[in-house]
Amino acid sequence: RPPGFTPFRKA
């Protein structure tokens, strides 16, 4: 997962 990964931002 990249450092900015969240389940709310899986663009």
Swiss-Prot record:
It comes from the Eukaryota. GO terms for cellular component: extracellular space. GO terms for biological process: negative regulation of blood pressure; positive regulation of smooth muscle contraction. Keywords: Bradykinin receptor impairing toxin, G-protein coupled receptor impairing toxin, Secreted, Toxin. It is found in: Secreted. Expressed by the venom gland. One of its GO terms (molecular function) is toxin activity. Belongs to the bradykinin-related peptide family. This is Megascoliakinin.
